[in-house]
């Protein structure tokens, strides 16, 4: 349903090139060093490359893990077969509730306010199911596409003032998955998310 996740390699490549230019005598920046200096420089090269590469690769892997999990259009027997997990203006059935997702995406200083909602049956669901459906709706607008983790939270607000916070940069915690929520008690879902300028935003 969604565009296949593909990663970019420019950050790691630029890091390696910049390190080579700064520390290697072969580029003509510094005079040729003796063997002990070259060995020291080589060790320094490897240490700095490790600092650059590990966080980047780790972040990309986590983004892909989140995308792979939340882009699935089924969860515990529930599915998006009727396209109820994306924006709709269809009249509701008696047993349905429409939950509006209200908030902002910020990309490179520009603020977007996408229009979206989800349509659910009036029933008790788990926080794991609700978390999945809400993030699925956000993925249709670009969440977890690219190489960088988003920043910010998604908040489920109930009519009695309760709140359930979903942290966009990581999966829902295991100990919260079985919390039960009646969909008819949900007021709305709010969010303030910040995307990297280097990722393509689909809003």
UniProtKB/Swiss-Prot annotation:
Looking up InterPro entries in the UniProt record yields: SuperAg_toxin_C, Toxin_b-grasp_Staph/Strep
Q: Which domain of life is it from?
A: Bacteria
Name a GO CC annotation attached to this entry.
extracellular region
- Protein keywords: Secreted
Q: Which stretches does the entry tag as region Sialic acid-binding motif?
A: 164-180
Q: Please name the Gene3D superfamilies in this protein's record.
A: 3.10.20.120
Question: Where is the major localization of this protein?
Answer: secreted
Q: What induces it?
A: Under the control of the Staphylococcus aureus exotoxin expression (Sae) two component gene regulatory system.
Q: Which residues cross the membrane?
A: none
Which compartments does it reside in? Secreted
Q: Does this entry carry the keyword Cytoplasm?
A: no
Q: Which Pfam families match?
A: Stap_Strp_tox_C (PF02876)
Q: Family per UniProt?
A: Belongs to the staphylococcal/streptococcal toxin family.
Known role: Plays a role in the inhibition of the host innate immune system. Inhibits phagocytosis and killing by human neutrophils by interacting with multiple neutrophil surface glycoproteins in a sialic acid-dependent manner.
* Domain writeup: The C-terminal domain contains a V-shape binding site for sialyl Lewis X.
Q: What is this protein called?
A: Enterotoxin-like toxin X
Task: Give the species this sequence originates from.
Answer: Staphylococcus aureus
């Amino acid at each position: 349903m969604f565009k296949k996740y593909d990663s970019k390699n420019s950050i790691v490549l630029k890091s390696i090139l910049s390190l080579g230019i700064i520390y290697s005598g072969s580029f003509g920046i510094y005079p040729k060093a003796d063997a002990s200096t070259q060995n020291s420089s080589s060790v320094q090269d490897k240490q700095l490359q490790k600092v650059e590469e590990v966080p980047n690769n780790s972040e990309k892997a986590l983004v892909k893990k989140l995308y792979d999990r939340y882009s699935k259009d089924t969860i515990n027997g529930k599915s998006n077969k009727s396209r109820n997990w994306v924006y709709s203006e269809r009249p509701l059935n008696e047993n349905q509730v429409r939950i509006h997702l209200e908030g902002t995406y910020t990309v490179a200083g520009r603020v977007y306010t996408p229009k979206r909602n989800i349509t659910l049956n009036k029933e008790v669901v788990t926080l794991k199911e609700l978390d999945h459906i809400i993030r699925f709706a956000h993925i249709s607008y670009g969440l977890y596409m690219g190489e960088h983790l988003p920043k910010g939270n998604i908040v489920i607000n109930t009519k009695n003032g309760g709140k359930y916070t979903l942290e966009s940069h990581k999966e829902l915690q295991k100990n919260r998955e079985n919390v039960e929520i009646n969909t008819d008690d949900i007021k709305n879902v709010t969010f303030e998310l910040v995307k990297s300028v280097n990722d393509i935003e689909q809003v």
